[in-house]
Amino acid sequence: MHLRFIFIIISFLFSFTIKANELEAHPIFAGGYQEAVFSVSDIEAQVKFYTEVAGWEILSEGNVSQRIITAYSLPKNTTAREVVMGNSGTKRGFIRLIEFVDVDQVQIRSSAQSWDTGGIFDVNFRVLSMQKKFKEMQEYDWQSASDPVEFSFGPFVVKEWLPRGPDGIVFAMIERVQPPLEGWPHLREMSRLFNATQVVADIEEAKDFYIDKLGFKLYLEHKGASSKEGPNVLGLPHNLTTKIDREVYILHPTGVNEGSVEILSFDGAVGRDFSALAVPPNLGILMLRFPVYDIDDIHQLSIEKNIEVIFPPMKVGLEPYGEIDLMAVKGPGGVWLEFYENND
């Protein structure tokens, strides 16, 4: 369960709604996002980090297909290397690291505050030992607006931290303190990705995109400010945590917290908008990739729902999946989403 809706609530005396529903197959999506794509400036350093600190392994590596380079409207002579990494034993929640060569780049969310909008704010991991990861990641120059925060949430005691690392990439890391975490047998250092967050300027527009257009279902909803002033991982001034409302929806094709998308808005905190920068080859959390049953169905749905199609379906090799049909759309806050059908 992703706990962003209580990041700045030290007490559990707040109201929230979790949408409980029977899991029903989505007619188009085969699940939540399969992978997040990171555009990085030093791929070797990042492979070392995910191997040594996250305890992940390399699943595939090679050059980015020229068909994808062309679809991204990059110069014809552009080349890029990619490495796909994952938590050993898991079948989803991967990270695809891409290093574009000799291109002009800026960070998508450079020096961003948590309330700045546009692009993808963070991706979420579980960890076994927050203190261990806190120390290790500081040694790799990851920093944050706060140290890890421990708090109670109903029957749970958790620790949470939002570190920022190279290329402006932000993690949301969660350790379950009590009761012991169950159902994560492959968690040794850092788990697979299970959620990604967008901070949006217009929460209704974002809900319309994911719920009304793509047919995602609600996993969790929360509205309100903190019940007490104090420390928080979002970097809000302690005296304003009770004055700034947050509105949060966690959404997924079948309403679970596995490859889900979280949309978050702030009422009373306004910052910069990075929507125009959330495009290749810029640096940071570049996009999410979702598996679909039929690429033609999602393409047709995009047209019917007036979703901006960045490029239409095309056949391309994409390891470790093999031959796929791939397309891309633009979502709220300029977010780049790709959908693929596996043909193998």
Predicted regions located by residue number:
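Positively charged n-region of N-terminal signal peptides that target proteins for export
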Residues: M1-F5
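Sec/Tat signal peptide C-region and signal peptidase I cleavage site
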Residues: F16-A20
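Vicinal oxygen chelate
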Residues: N21-I28, F38, L59-G62, V83, ...
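Post-signal peptide N-terminal segment of secreted/secretory-pathway proteins
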Residues: L23-E24, I28, G55, L59-E99, ...
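Amphipathic alpha-helical segments
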Residues: I43-E57, E136-E139, D202-L218, E304
